Design a protein with these regions (language model features):
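A structural signal for short, well-ordered beta-strand elements
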Residues: 28, 42, 65, 98, ...
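ALDH superfamily catalytic-core signature
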Residues: 227, 235-376, 439
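Conserved C-terminal structural/oligomerization subdomain of aldehyde/semialdehyde dehydrogenase
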Residues: 36-39, 225, 262, 316, ...
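Residue-level signal for inorganic ion chemistry
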Residues: 35, 72, 94, 116, ...
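Terminal low-complexity tails and localization/encapsulation signals of metabolic enzymes
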Residues: 1-41, 74-78, 126-152, 252, ...
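Glycine-rich loop-to-alpha-helix module at the N-terminal edge of alpha/beta enzyme cores
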Residues: 36-126
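Rossmann-like NAD(P) dinucleotide-binding subdomain of oxidoreductase/dehydrogenase enzymes
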Residues: 128-271, 323, 396
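Structural signal for hydrophobic packing residues in well-ordered secondary-structure cores
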Residues: 60, 64, 80-87, 91, ...
């Protein structure tokens, strides 16, 4: 696939210059649809991270640090237009790299462009305020960048998370060092190339591919970093926070989830059904905000089970290029993890299951989407994050029981309520432990304007919307005494 790329994937972007890893080493990038090698990527390490941080600081001390907010906004808007011009190419790259069906990959590319547009327009709209105080004082606050920000981006949604994290950081005038996941980093490199084309000053954005335990660990612990943004597993997120904590650096964590949808007897089932299924199988279930638990009130439980089982039976899994609703998992390692969870469900009833396309390569990382029914709320499959196309149906009797079950895991990223009862909608919006609660929908179309983040082991801090811009800035108070 290397001939289809307009950039060299074996390079890092450091200080506006494309260069190989200091060690000269590379890594193979594997296509999860068939197990073939796509290309080689740079295996950056601590030396490359150090060079990137130095370049980022130099950018802050130079042109980038002096650039007015409206000019930063123009750059991001220009970058968004370049992304739009490359939507189809970016989608094809992401489909090969992540195994994501083309339609889903294209939606991610459009979302990346939208982040650039939104943040480009917001760049000069964030400001401090004047504060009434004692006679003889003028007091005001300033919004300033943290400085050099580190961004560790996962493999499941590279473009979307680069947009919401790196895009927001650049908007506020930070200089970014991006470490993409070694399993899927091509669109990160493509974004960097487009940023250079857009005119982003040297060092404002630096990209160092590499292994998490090498480049990622070096970035988390680097004393020249002033803020870390991490999306990934709970275990790795804890390590990132510990490393950053030694330098007293703030961290935004977006981690795992076990997000429930609560379906009540009065729900509009025709409206709910597509969301119930799609929220669990999108990107083969490899979504932090995936809805892996479907809680259904007894009065409609059998109907929901039957209709979801029918929907699962209509699912076909195949290579990303076939653009089916479900593609492969990211790797055979992830396939082993998901298969292990499926084996733990041997004591459960399978209500519905998808099929593999006839031509699906044996070397691909495929699993059949699986719906389990009548699952106890304390079962492993109802409590642990699986990160695959697996959903569990859990019956409940009362609203109180539904809330108790929904809040019974360590996570709190997303929840959804399906009910026509307005009072119930408002009660549950408050009672559910989640960073986002959706009423009669799931995800709200993924709008870039909507703050996103979790509670509990789903992490802390907020990305997307204006909240992300506040998070990528720090407040300074100025009090002038003039008598």
């Amino acid at each position: 696939m290397t001939t289809d790329l307009w950039f060299d994937p074996t390079q890092c972007l450091v200080g506006g210059t494309w260069r190989p890893a200091t060690s000269g080493r590379t890594l193979p990038l594997i296509n999860p649809s068939d197990g073939s090698e796509i290309c080689q990527i740079a295996r950056g390490g601590a030396a490359d991270i150090d060079a990137a941080v130095t370049a980022a600081q130099a950018a802050l001390d130079g042109e980038w640090g002096r650039m007015p907010a409206f000019e930063r906004g123009r750059l991001l808007t220009r970058l968004g237009r370049l992304v739009l011009d490359k939507v189809d190419e970016l989608a094809a790259i992401e489909a090969a790299d992540v195994g994501k069906p083309l339609t889903q990959a294209r939606a991610d590319a459009l979302a990346l462009a939208r982040y650039c547009e939104f943040y480009g327009g917001a760049a000069d709209k964030i400001h401090g305020e004047t504060i009434p105080y004692l006679d003889g004082y003028t007091v005001y606050s300033l919004r300033e960048p943290h400085g050099v920000t580190g961004h560790i981006v996962p493999w499941n949604y590279p473009m979307q998370i680069i947009g919401r994290s790196v895009g927001a950081a650049l908007t506020m005038g930070n200089a970014a060092v991006l470490k993409p996941a070694e399993e899927a980093c091509l669109t990160a490199l493509a974004f960097a190339d487009l940023a250079v084309q857009a005119g982003l000053p040297a060092g404002a954005l630096n990209v160092v591919p590499g292994i998490g335990a090498e480049a990622g660990a070096a970035l988390s612990a680097h004393p020249g970093i002033h803020h870390i943004s991490f999306t990934g597993s709970v275990a790795t997120g804890a390590l990132v926070q510990q490393a950053a904590g030694k330098n007293v650096v703030p961290v935004t964590l977006e981690l795992g989830g076990k997000s429930p949808q609560l379906v009540f007897d009065d729900a509009d089932l025709d409206a709910a059904l597509p969301f119930l299924v799609n929220a669990g199988i999108q990107n083969a279930g490899q979504t932090c905000s995936a809805s892996s638990r479907i809680l259904v009130q007894r009065g409609v439980y059998e109907t929901v089970k039957s209709r979801m089982a029918e929907a699962y039976g209509a699912l076909t899994v195949g290579p990303a290029r076939d653009d089916l609703r479900v593609g492969p998992l990211i790797s055979n390692r992830q396939k082993e993890i998901v298969t292990g969870f499926l084996n733990k469900g041997a004591d459960l009833t399978i209500a519905g299951q998808g099929i593999l396309a006839d031509h699906t390569p044996d070397t691909g990382a495929y699993v059949r989407p699986t719906l389990f029914a009548d699952v106890p709320a304390d079962h492993t499959l109802a409590r642990d994050e699986i990160f695959g196309p697996v959903q569990v149906l859990i019956p409940f009797e009362t609203e109180e029981e539904a809330v108790r079950i929904a809040n019974s895991t360590d996570y709190g990223l997303v929840a959804s309520v399906w009910s026509r009862d307005g009072a119930r909608q408002m009660r549950l919006a408050k009672k559910l432990h989640a960073g986002q609660v959706f009423i009669n929908n799931y995800g709200a179309g993924g709008g870039v304007e909507l703050p996103f983040g979790g509670v509990g082991k789903s992490g802390h801090g907020r990305e997307k919307g204006f909240e992300a811009l506040y998070g990528f800035s720090q407040l300074k108070t100025v009090a002038a005494y003039h008598g």
